[in-house]
Curated annotation (Swiss-Prot):
The keyword Metal-binding does not apply. This is Teretoxin Tsu1.1. Belongs to the teretoxin A (TA) superfamily. Its main location: secreted. It comes from Terebra subulata. Expressed by the venom duct. It comes from the Eukaryota. GO terms for molecular function: toxin activity. The keyword RNA-binding does not apply. Keywords: Disulfide bond, Secreted, Signal, Toxin.
Amino acid sequence: MSCFPVLFVMMLLASQSVWAFPEPETRIGTARDAESMGVRSAVEECCENPVCKHTSGCPTTG
Protein backbone atom coordinates (compact mmCIF):
# COMPACT_ATOMS: atom_id res chain seq x y z
CA MET A 1 0.00 0.00 0.00
CA SER A 2 2.92 2.32 0.64
CA CYS A 3 4.20 1.88 -2.90
CA PHE A 4 1.36 3.92 -4.44
CA PRO A 5 2.56 7.32 -3.14
CA VAL A 6 6.07 6.45 -4.24
CA LEU A 7 4.91 5.57 -7.75
CA PHE A 8 2.83 8.75 -7.89
CA VAL A 9 5.79 10.91 -6.91
CA MET A 10 8.06 9.11 -9.35
CA MET A 11 5.52 9.65 -12.14
CA LEU A 12 5.39 13.36 -11.31
CA LEU A 13 9.17 13.62 -11.33
CA ALA A 14 9.35 11.69 -14.59
CA SER A 15 6.77 13.94 -16.24
CA GLN A 16 8.69 17.01 -15.05
CA SER A 17 12.14 15.90 -16.16
CA VAL A 18 11.47 13.39 -18.95
CA TRP A 19 12.80 15.92 -21.48
CA ALA A 20 16.23 15.58 -19.89
CA PHE A 21 16.18 11.80 -20.30
CA PRO A 22 14.10 11.08 -23.42
CA GLU A 23 12.98 7.54 -24.12
CA PRO A 24 11.87 6.36 -27.60
CA GLU A 25 8.28 5.80 -26.48
CA THR A 26 7.91 9.14 -24.66
CA ARG A 27 9.73 11.64 -26.87
CA ILE A 28 6.81 12.48 -29.16
CA GLY A 29 4.26 12.82 -26.36
CA THR A 30 6.64 14.98 -24.32
CA ALA A 31 7.24 17.31 -27.25
CA ARG A 32 3.49 17.72 -27.78
CA ASP A 33 2.89 18.36 -24.08
CA ALA A 34 5.65 20.98 -24.01
CA GLU A 35 4.16 22.76 -27.03
CA SER A 36 0.62 22.64 -25.63
CA MET A 37 1.77 24.09 -22.30
CA GLY A 38 3.86 26.77 -24.02
CA VAL A 39 7.07 25.80 -22.25
CA ARG A 40 9.22 26.96 -25.12
CA SER A 41 12.22 28.00 -23.03
CA ALA A 42 12.53 24.50 -21.57
CA VAL A 43 12.28 22.96 -25.04
CA GLU A 44 14.89 25.36 -26.40
CA GLU A 45 17.24 24.55 -23.52
CA CYS A 46 16.65 20.86 -24.21
CA CYS A 47 17.51 21.34 -27.87
CA GLU A 48 20.77 22.99 -26.83
CA ASN A 49 21.56 20.10 -24.50
CA PRO A 50 23.62 17.43 -26.33
CA VAL A 51 21.91 14.73 -24.28
CA CYS A 52 18.32 15.46 -25.31
CA LYS A 53 18.64 17.55 -28.47
CA HIS A 54 17.66 14.44 -30.44
CA THR A 55 14.01 14.72 -29.33
CA SER A 56 11.35 15.01 -32.01
CA GLY A 57 10.52 18.56 -30.87
CA CYS A 58 13.99 19.82 -31.78
CA PRO A 59 15.11 20.73 -35.31
CA THR A 60 17.67 18.29 -36.69
CA THR A 61 20.74 20.36 -37.49
CA GLY A 62 23.49 18.13 -38.78
